[in-house]
Structure formats: C-alpha cells, structure tokens
C-alpha cells in the first residue's frame, strides 16, 4: 500500500486552507473598512470576493455597505440576490427592511420582516422592529402580535395621556392589564371598548414605549376627555336642521364620568322630549347604567302600509315612560345588557288590532352581542328581546325579539373600500301595541333599515313604511372613502371620513293581526354619502322602492361597530 509522505500531506492541507484563509482575510479587511466608515473600500473588496468566492457574509456586508453609501437600489438588489442564494439566512430580510425603512417604504419593510420571521420564528430583532413599525403605522394589533411571539411586551408603567396620574377614574376600572403582565391585543381591545362605552372620551389609542429595563415597556393610553365648550353647540344646530330634533349633551359632569343628554323633537305631529343619563358604575370592568325618561305626542297615519278596510287609519298616540338599562362588557367580543321599561300610554283612533287604548306596559329588556370574527372580515351576531307582562306594572302580555348577523369586509389594506352585509329577522307573540310593532324604513335612528321607504309621511306622520309583527331583512352596502378630514377633537372627534355608498335592501313582512299588508318581497336600491367618526355615522341617502316605484331622500344616524 502506498502511503502519503508527511511533506505531501502538509502541502495538501495548505492548498485547502489557503482559499478559506484568503476569504477570511478579505472579510476581515472589509469589516475593518466598514468600522472606519470607509464603505466604498469595503464594497470594492466584497464585490471582488463575491465574484471569486461568494458567501452569505459577503452578501450581507456588501448590502450594508451599499446602504451606508445611500445606493439603495444596489443594496436592495444585493440583499435580494443573497436571500435567493441563502434562503435559510434571516439576515438578508432584516437588512432589506432597513433599506426600505430608509426609503420610508413601511409596507415593504413589514413584508421583509415577516419573511425574516418565517425563516426564523425566534428572530427577536425582526419581531421587535416589526412591532415598532406597526405601532408607527397605528397598527396596534399587528404590533402586539409581533411582540407576543416571544412573551413581550411586559408592562412596567401605565400612563394616561403621558401622565402617571389618570385624568379620570374610569381608566383604572376599564383596564384589563396591570404592571408586570404581558399586554395582548385582546386585553387592549377590551379596555378600548369599555372606554368608548363611557362616552366621555373623544378618541382612544395606545402607544408602547421601551424602558431602560430589559423587555419592559410603558403603556400609554391616549384618551383625551370630551369637552363641553361652546363649539359643541354646532352639533345640536345641525340636528335641528336635518331632524328637527336637537340634542344637548353634557359630558363627564365634574369629572364624575356621568353624562347628561337633553333632547327635544319639535317636528310637526311628532313631538318628543327625552332626558337621559349615562353613568359608568365604579366596579371592576365597569358596569354601564343608562336611564332615560321620555315623553311622546304623535299623530300617525298608517294608510299606506295598512290593509284598506274602510276605517280611518289615522290616530293619536301619547306616552310617558322611563327606562333603566345596564350593560357589561366582560370581553371585547361579548356585550350583555338587561333592563326595564315602563310606559304610561294613551292612544285614540278607530283602527282595530293595534291596542289604541290607555293600557300601560311594563317590559323586561335583554340583549347580547358576540363578535365572532375580527380580522379584515368582521362578523357579529346580536340579539334583543323584550317581555311585557301584567305583573310588571303593566296591563298587557306580549313579547318580541330580533336576531341579526352583521358582516363587514374590508377590501384593501388601507380600509378605504368595504362591503357590509346584514341579515336580520324579528318575531313576536301576543297582541302588540302600535308602539312596539316592527317598523321597517328610514328614520333618524332606525334599527330596521329599508332605505327606499321613509317612516314619516310628507305631512309629518309616522306610519308611512312597512310595519309587521314579524319580518326578515337583508341590507347590503358598498362604501368607498373619498377623504379623511382631520378635526383634532374640536367637535369631540379626531377626524371625519367622507364616503360615498351604494346599497340594496330586501325585506318581507308578516302581520298576525291582519292590520298591515304582508307577504310581498320588498326591494330597495340607492346610494348616497356618509360621514363617519370613530363611533358614529351620519348618512344622507336616496333610495327607491322597486316594488312601488316610490323614492325617498332621507338622513339618519347610526353607530359603528
């Protein structure tokens, strides 16, 4: 057997080691040049090395050198080539994110950081930078999801508008996170929903700031309190113009979190006065108490939706009532409510079947809402029911309930295009009084939208749209944002989104009492404009009924969800 001689073996090892030594030496020279700020020399050395003996380190350092030389395109091309040749190395995606951030391209930076986390889920640098980028874009959910990958952010201090002392006691009671706990999206969202339900804050937001302590962060709740300045009188003036129903709102009386609402509708044939109080109760998680007292004096004319039996379809309705209701929000996905309402009624007319008499009603009220899905698609199921009984201070026995399924899908990342579809159904038992019939159509604060039918006649009478003891209803709306108008909390909201919309509504009604027409499929189509704040909407639409060809131009307000 032939054996290698020792000199031959040494020569062979030397030949193998020379290229590696040479590569290491060139990399060392390039790193030294980079340390001295001589990125041009480093780029020259690394370019030659890649041509002769490419490596992941050479590509990474060359991309960094080009970035420091502000040659962004060459840096991007180099790092992308390196990522293609060495797909298991997350450094290329980390550095690409830095290149995109330098160009203020936040979307592509986020994409690169997500790719880095796909390659290495334990990449703390990419996770932290992704969370920081998301926070700067206002994407709190994305930021918290990125941090939560490795058990962050652990909360050190909780501030309100940058202050250690909370400006109102509801902050502490609504909050679901404490010092030393990991903040998750669910905890913040529950806190945010509770704060908005108090109705005393113009807006709510969250900022996460690092602290000198490792892995500790400060949570800053941004929630400016609403004011009762004279500028707020603009809204009642607009309500008087559009609805003849101005509402004076006094927020957070003496910083107690109690708010007062005074409303008077002076519309001909539809007078109404209401006093309402909203008071969060100082319990863990908050319990919301809303109490209202209402007076109504109205003239109705139901000749359009009623079956023509030859009787006079006009009548007068009056009532004085009180309502108290409590709501609890254990989680942002779940809301529960219960209450009681008493009405002292007086009604007079010749129309049979709708309790035109002086019998009073006492009712138990229950409602629940479940947010089933909360991503680009938001899906919610909610139900309401009332139970009227003679042993509840009333003179009538009946019940009714509704269930609805709300869906909204955002078509783009910016949230400027969306489609909303709602399916709703209601039913009842017992002889319903006219004031608890289901009414479909458009009114100031309508719950059952059929936007080609106005609930009010040109003469100002209620009873102009379909009414029923049970119904099914579908609403479909597409809207697109035209512009976001900043208001800087001048009118107690930070901004208003101006949108245009088109819609199609379909419904079918039924009436056990055989007072109103039933069974026909109703279809309304139309369009209009919408103003949206973070919590409310104002809509101005024109809808046309395909069943009878009638059209209506109407304004109404709603609540965002």
Describe these PLM feature segments:
Residues 24-55, 61-64, 68:
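Alpha-helical segment of the N-proximal tetratricopeptide repeat
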Residues 197-382, 443-468, 537-539, 544-561:
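Gram-negative/organellar outer-membrane beta-barrel architecture
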Residues 230, 363-500, 510, 555:
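C-terminal outer-membrane beta-barrel translocator/porin domains of Gram-negative envelope proteins
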Residues 35-36, 68-69, 102-103, 136:
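Register position in tetratricopeptide repeats
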Residues 86, 91, 98, 102-241, ...:
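Periplasmic polypeptide-binding modules associated with outer-membrane biogenesis and secretion
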Residues 27-28, 57-61, 91-95, 125-129:
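Alpha-solenoid helical repeat scaffolds
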């Amino acid at each position: 057997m032939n054996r290698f001689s020792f000199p031959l073996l040494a020569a062979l090892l030397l030949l193998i080691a020379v290229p590696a030594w040479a590569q290491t030496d060139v990399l060392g020279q390039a790193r030294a040049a980079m340390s001295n700020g001589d990125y041009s020399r480093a780029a020259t050395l690394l370019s030659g090395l890649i041509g002769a003996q490419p490596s992941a380190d050479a590509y990474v350092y060359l991309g960094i050198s080009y970035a420091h030389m502000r040659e962004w395109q060459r840096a991007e091309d180099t790092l992308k080539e390196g990522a293609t040749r060495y797909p298991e190395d997350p450094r290329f995606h980390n550095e690409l994110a830095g290149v995109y951030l330098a160009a203020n391209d936040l979307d592509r930076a986020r994409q690169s950081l997500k790719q880095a986390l796909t390659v290495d889920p334990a990449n703390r640098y990419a996770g932290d930078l992704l969370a920081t980028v998301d926070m700067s874009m206002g994407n709190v959910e994305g930021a918290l999801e990125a941090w939560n990958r490795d058990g962050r952010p652990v909360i050190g201090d909780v501030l309100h508008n940058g202050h250690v002392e909370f400006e109102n006691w509801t902050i502490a009671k609504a909050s679901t996170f404490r010092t030393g706990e990991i903040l998750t999206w669910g905890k913040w969202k529950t806190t945010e929903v509770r704060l908005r339900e108090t109705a005393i804050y113009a807006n709510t937001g969250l900022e996460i700031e690092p602290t000198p302590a490792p892995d500790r962060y400060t949570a800053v709740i941004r929630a400016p309190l609403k004011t009762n300045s004279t500028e707020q009188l603009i809204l009642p003036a607009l309500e008087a113009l559009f609805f003849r129903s101005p509402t004076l709102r006094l927020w957070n009386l003496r910083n107690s979190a109690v708010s007062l609402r005074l409303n008077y509708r002076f519309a001909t044939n539809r007078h109404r006065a209401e006093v309402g109080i909203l008071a969060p109760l100082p319990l863990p998680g908050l319990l919301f108490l809303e109490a209202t007292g209402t007076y109504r004096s109205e003239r109705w004319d139901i000749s359009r939706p009623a079956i023509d039996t030859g009787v006079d379809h006009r009548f007068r309705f009056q009532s004085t009532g009180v309502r108290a209701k409590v709501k609890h929000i254990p989680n942002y996905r779940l809301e529960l409510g219960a209450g009681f309402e008493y009405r002292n009624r007086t009604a007079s007319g010749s129309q049979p079947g709708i309790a035109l008499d002086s019998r009073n009603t006492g009712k138990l009220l229950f409602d629940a809402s479940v947010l089933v899905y909360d991503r680009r698609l938001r899906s919610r199921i909610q139900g309401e029911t009332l139970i009227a009984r003679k042993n509840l201070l009333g003179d009538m026995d009946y019940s009714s309930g509704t269930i609805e399924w709300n869906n909204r899908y955002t078509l783009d990342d910016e949230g400027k295009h969306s489609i909303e579809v709602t399916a709703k159904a209601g039913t009842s038992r017992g002889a319903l009084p006219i004031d608890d019939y289901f009414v479909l159509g458009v009114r100031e604060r309508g719950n059952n939208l059929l936007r080609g039918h106005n609930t009010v006649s040109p003469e100002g009478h209620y009873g102009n749209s379909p009414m029923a003891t049970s119904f099914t209803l579908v609403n479909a709306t597409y809207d697109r944002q035209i512009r976001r108008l900043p208001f800087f909390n001048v009118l107690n909201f930070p901004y208003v989104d101006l949108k245009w919309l088109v819609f199609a509504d379909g419904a079918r009604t039924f009436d056990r009492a055989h007072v109103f027409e039933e069974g026909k499929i109703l279809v309304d189509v139309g369009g209009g404009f919408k103003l949206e704040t973070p919590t409310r909407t104002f809509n101005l639409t024109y809808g046309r009924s395909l069943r009878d060809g009638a059209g209506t131009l109407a304004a109404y307000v709603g609540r965002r969800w």
